[in-house]
Amino acid sequence: MSVNLNNKKESWYMFKIGLVIAFSAVLAACSGGNGTKNGEALLTYGNEAPTLTQNPEQLDLLIFGGTAGVGLETVKLALARGHKVTSVSRRPERMTLEHDNLNNVKGDFVKSDSYASFIEGKDAIISAIGVDASSEKITIYSEGMKNVLKAIGSNSSTQVVTITGIGAGDSKGHGGFFYDRIVNPFLLEEDYADKTRQEAILRSSQSRWTIVRPGFLTDDVSETRYRVLFDMDGVQSGDISRADVSHFLLAVVEQGAYINETVFLSN
């Protein structure tokens, strides 16, 4: 009987995923892509996108989840800017890049012994991991961050940057009607519950941390016209490209900027 109940639960969850994906496609086709604050464009709110300097000092970076999405874009940009990169992922064979300054290794965000030998001496650690939507409790973000902080030690000068998103902490309820009422509660509730826990763990730590909450991610090219906001009051998220998120991440670690800050990024 328990097997049948589990099968029914899984079938119902897959049906919800299909329904939300269909609605999401319609929504994406109608979306203007720009965020708002109190109904106005974000153009005059928050900070402009930072400017990357020419010929930055070489950094030694560790990136979790560097084989896809924002993580891969960040690896690409970091290498292009002359940095050393260690990409840690569960499936390193998915890496599409080869570079003299790239160390592509197998590791698990929640198992510090799988990456402990690579973490010493790193200038910054960036977490760009993601997991599939699930109705089961998710703990990878919070448990993984606990282990990362333990691995670097309380007196480390290493900057720790993590990507969460709209739905974590006080950003919940700022994604627009469809996202807030359908996508988040139906598909992403467990995901963002754990991202919220991860944010709390970082804030209570003694590390040099930065929490980055990007808006709705796209595969567009980088235009660096996004805004950097601190206050979510009256804000509704827009889009931002993964390339633009990587641009911000590199600015943060190169300039030592936004230390102990939680920021929201959106066009």
What residue ranges belong to the model's regions?
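Conserved Rossmann-fold cofactor-binding substructure of NAD(P)-dependent oxidoreductases
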Residues: 103-122
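N-terminal Rossmann-fold cofactor-binding loop
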Residues: 88-93, 109
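C-terminal motif of bacterial Sec signal peptides marking the signal peptidase cleavage site
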Residues: 28-29
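NAD(P)-cofactor binding segment of oxidoreductase domains
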Residues: 132-161, 197
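N-terminal Rossmann NAD(P)H-binding glycine-rich loop of SDR-like oxidoreductase domains
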Residues: 61-81
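Glycine/proline-rich active-site loop of Rossmann-fold NAD(P)-dependent oxidoreductases
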Residues: 205, 221-226, 252-261
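Conserved beta-loop-beta element that borders a ligand/cofactor-binding pocket
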Residues: 199-221
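Substrate-positioning beta->alpha
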Residues: 194, 212, 240-250, 261
